[in-house]
Amino acid sequence: MAFYDREIKRVCESCPRLLILMINSVFSKHHSEDAEIIFLDKEQNIDSGENTTYMDMFLEIESCRYHIEYQLLEGNMAIRMVEYGMKETIRGLRQNGDITRVSDGRYEIEIIMPLQAVVFLAGANKEDTITVNLHLPDGKMVTYDLPCLSASETVSELSRKKMYLLIPFQQVQLYSRMLKAKHYTERTKLKLAEALYHFKLDAKKELDNLHENGILNANEVELLVTSLHNIEDNLLNNDDLIREKVTEMGDEDYIALSDRLIQQGIEQGIKQGIK
């Protein structure tokens, strides 16, 4: 399951402009599309549980800090979000020296939590937010909401929300079913093969449309299509028959511009190598 951890981080780091667009959309920010992104913590935190993988991403854009969790399956992330957010905040304070300061004879500590969000890659979380109620020792309670995003939405909906980075991951909603694929009948396997094929087809059509309308550049499309194929290949590792059927379907019905861009890049690289 660490595959999805590596893949989402690869895509985010390779397409910084698209990551900024998603963050601007989720948090109603207005960061410049070419702003520098500082990845503060690239360590992987993977839960030891059998069915869940958690993926941390701490970053800073124009002095604003963000914490994004990419979760493979559905689950309650509230406790982990508070834990990770607080842990990273305290770690940053300690790196900058003493975490306390004296003001009018009183010791104070200022804790600024990063803006946080959860992205569900396979599970379709039914709520738009996770509410956190933090009860303090003095009886006060602080309530705040964490935005929840789902890669299982339609590609057009992901585009509307400017979550272009998640388009290749839409097919991950078949993750749980693909894990059990070897136990399915041939008829069910054929349906899964068709579902995977149509996820790929719809994604490529959407990416082509975004490129033709000047929303995505050629390099971004190429990176997202590469991710699309990487994820499909990983899902197909669970059953040879489904892989065979998806391969047979091919792309004959639709020659995607995104595939041509990849081929053009290869050919251009060969030409440059010859020179």
What are these regions (language model features)?
Residues 2, 240-275:
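Intrinsic-disorder/low-complexity detector
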Residues 1-239:
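Conserved single-residue anchors adjacent to enzymatic active/cofactor-binding motifs
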